[in-house]
């Protein structure tokens, strides 16, 4: 919405002091460590010649598209308030021979759309209708965020920095293959309300503060926008961001309006070793990622933020509001990238970027803004599960190395690091996962992030791709730099002073991990499942082999063997159905949880009764000397394994129907 000049002047004057005071309440600024931080070349002026820039980007993209088998992609670069480069690569629709055109082709940039939600929310902050530090429940009438941590409400600022402490979830409902399964925004928020598993992060990351990315939290922000403005989320975005910027080829509506359908790119997945077009993705939480837009439209949005809210005579934010939004709002460590209000910080070659990534099951996107240089780089491909994380970063790194080079000081490990290296060793798990639903079980499919000391007095981090899978050297207490590049990570400690958390994985402040408790070690549980499965098989075989003899003996001894055998059949059936469900979810990522899973959970619940019954027979079997001593030991061990298996199911939320 365009502001008249006198209203703009009034807001700038009246809000300037408030924004300045708010900024003082923020976290410390990014602090370099001069001896190990990149030293930018001060004479660098960035890209100047569009033709030279196009030739360079062509070389990088051609190699990347070929290496990563991407079907189509686009790159848009802006500088000094104008598009310097906008190029398409490959196909938007390979089956019909339609090439990617950044001026006409709509891509689905996923979570990059969150930046529009945060910008809209910032507009309401400017208007005095929303306070950054107010309890979000102040603006909600249809639902409320639980008061899990009394005296520590979730604030608007927490939503914008992903520091509210919500658990995460997505499988079976976040991205759908049909609008028939879409729910009304309020209904969706209520049905999929996550638990608050951490207190809101306030900056004390050495005492357990954790930031964790939340799609649900962003959709909640979309509801606040609608409630406060009196408009639907879509109407507000269209009237107050799209129209002032002239973004006529962008929409959050699902499916896209008829006027845009013919220009929408197809998304591709790797199915059986071949890239195949996939159905349109419907997003349950539109404010978190249902955007469809051309590269040209994204360029207009980038330019507006690069110019602190201004675009061709219009404004989407005041200068003061934009500066507040772009400033550091949360930081886990002064030497690490922090979070702005909606954006993330990144530092490459000693320069600060405001960034956001976007992933759907079909599209991968990077939004990068060198805010001090007035330069933006947008990159997107329509081939998910192909374009790797490291490949996506290579374009930005190549661009920065060419146009904003820096000298990276060599770094030497401290001589005494070996004395404390063991403090960091262990396995860590991303804190962005479900804690209360069956989705937690998917954490068992990964061994987590492994941190191992090396003979070189460094740490080797493995178990995750991209820039993390390298060696890291200590440059400050609990703070590490990659040996061959400038990314930084850090560890934080619990109240007992023990290393408990790994911060800024992939240079993102919302990507944090905690040390995996011994009771949740995936290897332990897989070993237990294997042993229990063997026990279940033995129980079934024992029942069948001794059926005739037990029938002649009759009585409780026979009932004990039947109980254990049925327990084995039921739990083995559960394991088979659970495995088939995982395969089904892998092959149909947009579908709901398969009914096979519900059947399996039902069989496992029935098995609990037989497990309890079998456990009750153990002391009786020993007291009355049923069977041989070997058979009694075997029976007892099977029951112990069965009980341990139930504990494992409980640990991973597989006991009962804990579906989202």
Residue map of PLM features:
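Short, conserved catalytic-motif segment at the N-terminal edge
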Residues: 45-107, 129-131, 146-148, 194-204, ...
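Short active-site loop at a secondary-structure junction
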Residues: 66-74, 96-158, 202-217, 286-289
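N-terminal signal peptide c-region/cleavage motif recognized by signal peptidases
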Residues: 20-23
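Peripheral terminal and inter-domain segments
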Residues: 390-660
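Short, well-ordered beta-strand elements
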Residues: 355-356, 366-370, 374-383, 500-505
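Bacterial N-terminal signal peptides that target proteins for export
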Residues: 2-11
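Boundary at the C-terminal end of the N-terminal hydrophobic targeting segment
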Residues: 25, 29-31
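Short, surface-exposed loop or secondary-structure junction motifs
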Residues: 87-93, 148-371, 399
């Amino acid at each position: 919405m365009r502001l008249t000049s006198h209203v703009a002047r009034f807001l700038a004057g009246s809000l300037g002091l408030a924004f300045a005071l708010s900024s003082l309440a923020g976290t410390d600024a990014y602090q370099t460590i001069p001896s190990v931080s990149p030293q930018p070349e001060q004479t660098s002026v960035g890209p100047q010649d569009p033709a030279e820039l196009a030739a360079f980007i062509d070389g990088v993209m051609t190699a990347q598209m070929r290496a990563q088998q991407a079907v189509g992609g686009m790159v848009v670069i802006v500088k000094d308030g104008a598009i310097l480069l906008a190029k398409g690569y490959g196909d938007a629709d390979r089956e019909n021979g339609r090439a990617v055109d950044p001026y006409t082709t709509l891509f689905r940039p996923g979570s990059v759309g969150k930046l529009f939600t945060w910008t809209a929310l910032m507009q309401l902050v400017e208007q005095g209708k929303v306070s950054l530090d107010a309890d979000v429940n102040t603006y909600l009438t249809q639902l409320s965020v639980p008061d899990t941590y009394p005296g520590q409400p979730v604030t608007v600022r927490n939503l914008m920095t992903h520091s509210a402490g919500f658990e995460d979830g997505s499988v079976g409902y976040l991205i759908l293959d049909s609008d028939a399964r879409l729910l009304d925004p309020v209904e969706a928020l209520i049905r999929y309300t996550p638990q608050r598993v951490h207190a809101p992060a306030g900056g004390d990351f050495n005492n357990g503060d954790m930031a964790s990315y939340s799609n649900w939290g962003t959709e909640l922000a979309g509801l606040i926008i609608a409630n406060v403005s009196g408009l639907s989320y879509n109407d507000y975005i269209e009237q107050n961001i799209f129209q002032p910027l002239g973004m006529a080829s962008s929409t959050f509506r699902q499916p896209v309006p008829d006027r845009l359908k013919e220009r929408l790119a197809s998304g591709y997945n790797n199915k059986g070793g071949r890239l195949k077009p996939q159905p349109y993705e419907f997003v349950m939480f539109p404010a978190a990622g249902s955007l469809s837009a051309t590269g040209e439209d994204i360029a207009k949005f980038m330019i507006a933020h690069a110019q602190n809210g201004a675009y061709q005579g219009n404004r989407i934010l005041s200068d003061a509001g934009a500066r507040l939004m772009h400033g550091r709002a949360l930081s886990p460590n002064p030497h690490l990238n922090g979070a702005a209000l909606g954006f993330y910080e990144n530092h490459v070659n000693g320069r600060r970027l405001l960034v956001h990534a976007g992933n759907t099951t079909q599209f991968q996107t990077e939004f990068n803004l060198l805010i001090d240089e007035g330069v933006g780089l947008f990159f997107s491909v329509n081939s998910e599960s192909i374009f790797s994380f490291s490949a996506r970063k290579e374009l930005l790194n190549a661009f920065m190395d060419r146009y904003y080079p820096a000298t990276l000081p060599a770094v030497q490990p401290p001589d005494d690091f070996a004395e404390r290296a063991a403090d960091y060793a262990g396995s860590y798990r991303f804190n962005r996962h479900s804690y209360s639903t069956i989705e937690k079980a998917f954490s068992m499919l990964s061994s987590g992030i492994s941190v191992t000391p090396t003979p070189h007095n460094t740490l080797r981090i493995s178990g995750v791709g991209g820039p993390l899978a390298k060696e890291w050297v200590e440059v400050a207490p609990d703070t590490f730099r990659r040996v061959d590049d400038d990314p930084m990570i850090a560890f934080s400690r619990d109240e007992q002073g023990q290393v408990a958390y790994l911060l800024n994985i992939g240079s993102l402040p919302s990507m944090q991990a905690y040390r995996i408790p011994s009771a949740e070690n995936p290897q332990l549980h897989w070993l237990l499942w294997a042993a229990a499965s063997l026990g279940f098989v033995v129980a079934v075989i024992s029942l069948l082999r001794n059926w005739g003899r037990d029938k002649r003996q009759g009585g409780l001894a026979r009932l004990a063997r039947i109980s254990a055998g049925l327990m084995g059949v039921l739990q083995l059936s559960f394991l088979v159905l659970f495995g088939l469900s995982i395969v089904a979810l892998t092959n149909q990522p947009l579908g709901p949880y398969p009914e096979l899973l519900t059947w399996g959970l039902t069989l496992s619940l029935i098995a609990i009764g037989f497990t309890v019954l079998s456990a009750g027979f153990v002391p009786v079997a020993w007291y009355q000397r049923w069977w041989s001593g070997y058979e009694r030991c075997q029976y007892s061990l099977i029951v112990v394994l069965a009980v341990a298996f139930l504990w494992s199911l409980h640990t991973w939320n597989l006991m009962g129907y804990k579906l989202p």
